[in-house]
Amino acid sequence: MTPPDRSLDTVAVTAWIDEDPDPTTREELAALLRAHENGDAEATAALADAFSTILRLGAAGLRGRPGAGPGRMNRVVVIRAAAGLAAYLRDKLGAGFAVVIGYDAHHGSDALARDTASVITGAGGRALLFESHCPTPVLAFALRRLGADAAVMATTSRRPPRDGGGCEDRADANGCDDLSSWAVYLGGRVVTGPGRGARIVPPHDAEIAERIAAVGSLDGVPMPDSGWEGLGAEVVEEYTDSAARAARMRAAAPLRVVLAAMRGEGGRICRDALSRVGLDVVVVPEQFDPDPDSPAVVLSAPEESGRLDPALALARQVDADLVIAIGPDAGRCCAAIPDKHVTGGWRRLTGDEVGTVLGEQAAELAAFTGTGILANSIVSSRMLRKIAQAHGLGHRNALTGFKWICRVPGLVFGYEEALGYCVDPAAVRDKDGISAAVRLAVLASVLKQQGRSIADLLDRLAREHGLHATSPLSLRVEDPSLISAAMERLRAGGAPASLAGSPVVDVFDLMDGASDGNGGRLPPADGLIFKTAADDRVVVRPSGTEPKLKCYCEVVVPVAVEDPVEVARRTAADRLDAIRADLRGVLGL
């Protein structure tokens, strides 16, 4: 966003009202303007807040709270963005460019998608609009499958409130603010190579933003009432088949999977894909059907949110072998496995643990040809590099976000610790919770046929490469300037001297460009890496979307062949607790 300007320009407010096609936001502004003119200080403050910033497109597309005005997500902002995207594509390709457009099940997303389709059509493009809500991986699949030049996903979801509390820390997240998004992917003739079909990165985001800024009055934006093409069940069916094929095989032994769809768009597709490979799927009924009023689930913290509790209860009831949950947009996937050492009998796997077993499976498959690259974000576990090396494959680091991971040349598998996995980059250049769920479940069935389990595989890898245990620390603040100040202190000599009793022997600033693992450098990023003599590591970076400072902690504990891994796991947990305590003291947030 642009820097806030708290002065109130009533002429600009009136002009916005005049061109707003949405009666709800138009009346919202009109009522505030009338109250302002009558001396209502609260209305004046609300108007000033709505018009103090301009929501701008970045590498994440458009993201903002819904509401009226240029600083919120609404139909006016999206129409302008669509016009800018159309101008960008027209400048690159001429007329006839193709854009796939999808939306989620939340209220208002369909209107944003239809406006986008109308603008693309009016600009001489070919708009392909999903006829119903769809999961994000289906949109990313359609972009590559149909050879389109771009794709847009319109969503309205929930995010933590601005009062300093966090939805991910609550069992019920209904108090969260909305956060709408308008995500942009490029492919077809615009982007070639490994980035074809991935989300935008620089310089594309800035080039599109320039054209959005040049859009004048909406009166000059042609918006026909028809002319776009509908995408129906056939594309969804193709994606479902593709997700099933991503497993490379059918279930090898009977396996019962409990599936939690978190009231999002991916439940039916994920259930069908799992069934097609011969798995017995039991869905969590209260979380299965899409709910336009449901708050989003912070799936990357299921153990805190309590959202997995119904699935775990059902798993105990039906004697399941595996629990899988996919995020509301089906981009992320988390899992739980039976474990007698855990209270309740079920162990929730971390994103790094799922990434480890999926990475081992991908490496075994790729080793037959001797080619392929495994990649993960720089904040994720270093275990994947060791797996790749053990199989004679390459490994790459990437900045956080799948827009970077999916651009790795030769990629056969990529993941980030926040429960995102790309298991079939030839089909979907984004995180794909459905394909990951299918591959993980089939792997569990193969292991079951061999008399083993996912837990056994994790233990084997720990003995081969050391137990790599990871845990995050997120510090939320009300004043974002506190995060900048904390990073400045760390860079100015305030780095910890030791972590968990081990001296810090290396400090690396990601602004200098970290190694990609192949002799190259990653783009500069705001973050710091601390390594200790014990080979523990912490990555500290500001969140890109929330007022948080995030710390990604990893410890490595050697495991002798004759030693129980559970002992090493307890040692690692104690060390992670000590590291988090040390970080809290150093950061002072």
PLM regions and their residue ranges:
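Phosphate-binding and adjacent anionic-ligand microenvironments
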Residues: R170-A171, L179, R316, A320-L322, ...
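Short acidic, glycine/serine/threonine-rich loops at helix termini
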Residues: D110-D115, A140-R144, R162-V190, G220-M223, ...
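Gly/Ser/Thr-enriched, mixed-charge loops and adjacent short helices
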Residues: W16, D20-E27, A46-L55, G165-D309, ...
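Conserved phosphate/anionic-ligand binding catalytic regions in large, soluble enzymes, centered on
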Residues: F51-G71, T156-S157, D177, A261-I269, ...
